[in-house]
UniProtKB/Swiss-Prot annotation:
Record-given protein name: Ribosome-recycling factor
Keywords for this protein: Cytoplasm, Protein biosynthesis
Cystines in this chain: none
Function recorded in the entry: Responsible for the release of ribosomes from messenger RNA at the termination of protein biosynthesis. May increase the efficiency of translation by recycling ribosomes from one round of translation to another.
Gene Ontology terms describing biological process: translational termination
Subcellular locations according to the entry: Cytoplasm
Keyword Cytoplasm: yes
GO cellular component labels: cytosol
Recorded family membership: Belongs to the RRF family.
Positions of transmembrane segments: none
Pfam family of the protein (one): RRF
GO MF term set: ribosomal large subunit binding
Chief location bin: cytoplasm
Amino acid sequence: MEDYKAFLDEKMNKVLLSLDNEYKTLRTGRISSNIFDRICIQYHDRRTPITQVSSIRIPEARLVVIQPWDKSILNKIEQAILNSDLSMNPSNDGSVIRIKVPNLTSERRQEIVKHAKKIAEEHKISTRNIRQDLNNKVKKQEKESEITEDCLKRILDDIQKSTDMYIKKIDSILESKIQEIMEA
């Protein structure tokens, strides 16, 4: 039975880590270089995140400076940022890209909150799918007489309690992210 708990915790913690990584790429009131993690360009015949081909600095609260290691990709980076969903207007001076980051409008904040809720729901679904897979494995063991019916009920109950706990964690992470988006 302990094997199920360890397996469940490992899978559920991966879901929480994935949620955290996705939330790092959302723009909030505070600017972070993580928002550029998902922006990619074609570089040496493969899609490459701009974070891997340039340095990204934030010298001021509302200014981002992107300095590619290869100047020939400046235009590609600029175009990728323009085509992204970040609503930013980069300025290319021939050696670096500067982005003056405007304050988020209330409409844009609402869009980001909506997207954050969608991401949280996707991760809740992943959590429920993990629960369903584990429930099916345990039920199969009971059918094959590897565990008793009482043990099955106890394990299923533990799985449900753990699932509920992880879904509450996802809700808590979502609430703090919404608060972060709405302030500043």
